[in-house]
Amino acid sequence: MTMFNKIVKEFQWGQHKVRLETGEIARQASGAVIVDVEDTVVLATVVGARTAKPGQDFFPLTVDYLEKTYAAGKIPGGFFRREGRPSEGETLISRLIDRPLRPLFPEGFYNEVQVVIHVLSLNPEIPADIPALIGASAALAVSGLPFNGPVGAARVAYINNEYVLNPTRPQMKESALDLIVAGTERAVLMVESEAQQLSEEVMLGGVVFGHEQMQIAIDAIHDLVREGGKPEWDWQPAAKNEPLIARVTELAQADLLAAYQLRDKQARSAKLKEIYAATSAKLEEDAAAGGTVAADKATVGNVLFDIEAKIVRTQILNGEPRIDGRDTRTVRPIEIRTGVLPRTHGSALFTRGETQALVVATLGTKGDEQNIDALEGEYRERFMLHYNMPPFATGETGRVGSPKRREIGHGRLAKRALAACLPSADEFGYSIRVVSEITESNGSSSMASVCGGCLALMDAGVPMKAHVAGIAMGLILEGNKFAVLTDILGDEDHLGDMDFKVAGTEQGVTALQMDIKIQGITREIMQVALAQAKEGRLHILGKMTSAVSGANTVLSDYAPRMITIKINPEKIRDVIGKGGSVIRALTEETGTTIDISDDGVVTIASTSSEGMAEAKKRIENITLEVEVGQVYEGTVLKLLDFGAIVNILPGKDGLLHISEIANERIKDINDYLKDGQQVKVKVIQTDEKGRVRLSAKALLNDAANGAPQGEPTPQQ
């Protein structure tokens, strides 16, 4: 007899066997599920508060994805030898899980919900993000919380013109597409992808393929809930306060309509604040006059927001101008300036309407690459992109400091968009960091970062394969009527049913991100939306190409120059020296940065061409191979009874036997040589142990016979 009511469901999913378990671990959580995909094991837990906090006016959902180093058989680094703050990868996966779950909680549900996913075991070939998303969905489904799921998820690759479900890491290296799609049985809710300039048709096909394949996982979660699910919560949304809605509509609708005729964001925002304050004040007067308690500001704010949404959505669906006066297909005015900052390696100021990004590109050496100690193994990242949005960008005050989750997510999206068009390390040996400083924001700042990032890279002299532009799109759906909005504003993002961002070149898409709030978006609607996004992207690409036709052919004076030479890998230790003494002296004395790879490729970088040339010369001298028959200018290091030790190259000495000094017999070597004397010698023999025999006599004989002696190689 066991104390556990353990429920297990197993299913074959593509090339992987998946196991779902509940009822044994974390039984005090509202819901807990273990997902095992070929030895990648995650524990997903959900805890929901039974009541909402008083005055709560938003849904407080938090998702934390945590990787434990023991999962990969490792001990954490650092002084304390324990996991610290979440890595960038953990933050991104937390966001990935949050995005499809959040829209499935019912409107008005304000109870605090926390989803925590622990990675307990990791097969390096099976990424943990999809198991984590499936686990979070299953844990919510078995918890009984009001949740309109379950959600399924799948990763889709595109290899040899075929879609592949949940590929392994080795397969991903061959794929032209890395696409994650999540959704319910009926609809896609979230897409996150990176692609090698693929067509819109291929991208949409990947979304549809992933949605079809995730149904297997959704069915398994339903089976798990039937046997191991907890009773559903008896939660009902609060009844709508119809008298309050009618009164707020009467007080504010006309003013809100007028406010949305103001095309300037700051003026419109100021007017809306006035309306909110005036409406609340009037309701308080009504309550005081009637001897009742006025509705709290949060409730009034929600009613006003619903009225705003209805006004904006109705206007757009009726074909009226959008908030800023544009039609649905027009991109805001664009201004481009490059070379903005005098001392940076590359810079661009990209302005689209009231959204502006100041983007800076910096070139570095191999030593500047980011070393990432991920759970699946260490690797180096050559290209970095960081996105910052300070509060002044929206005319507000706020905290300034370490990047928030949103900034990390936007930076990763922009990085994915540009990565496909970067030159390879063989073509362009620099490490690259792009920083996007958002100086104004009214929608689509991540896509402004893509455009500005491409321009800054070209200004820095990075030979991009093509111009890359990004555009943010919106969609409004009411019944059978829908409208796709090109280049959305911040307000349109909040009031719409879908926002998606597409980045790419003239040839195709490099990144696609979708977030869908409702379940009525069909394949046909997505097809129309992607076609309209392409039209907008090509318009922006035309503006960018007119401003900057291609990458600068000359690097900034302040960017490091770089040369590479190849040495014998066995000579690497000679260049490094004992404890790094030789390479340290080289870098300090020549003012260069020197990187040596295991295959013997030496990269020398510096802003000084003279320093680079000096470092190259010294490394070549250190790594010169002793050749039989070659003549060297050596230095006598030590005199022996039977000859002398002569240094002919750095770190390479040879024996000049007494019989090889002169043609005549020598009684006392001191009559011919002295310590420190420069002597011209010829290599006559080397052996497998690296010992070198030298001769001065051979040169005398060569001279007597008229044989060419060659130029001596001087020692460093």
Swiss-Prot record:
Keyword Transport: no
Catalytic activity: RNA(n+1) + phosphate = RNA(n) + a ribonucleoside 5'-diphosphate
S1 motif domain boundaries: 629-697
Keywords: Cytoplasm, Magnesium, Metal-binding, Nucleotidyltransferase, RNA-binding, Transferase
CDD domains according to UniProt: KH-I_PNPase, RNase_PH_PNPase_1, RNase_PH_PNPase_2, S1_PNPase
EC number: 2.7.7.8
Any one of the GO BP annotations: mRNA catabolic process
Pfam families linked to this entry: KH_1, PNPase, RNase_PH, RNase_PH_C, S1
Primary location group: cytoplasm
Function according to Swiss-Prot or TrEMBL: Involved in mRNA degradation. Catalyzes the phosphorolysis of single-stranded polyribonucleotides processively in the 3'- to 5'-direction.
Protein family according to the UniProt entry: Belongs to the polyribonucleotide nucleotidyltransferase family.
Protein name per its UniProtKB record: Polyribonucleotide nucleotidyltransferase
The organism of origin for this protein: Paraburkholderia xenovorans (strain LB400)
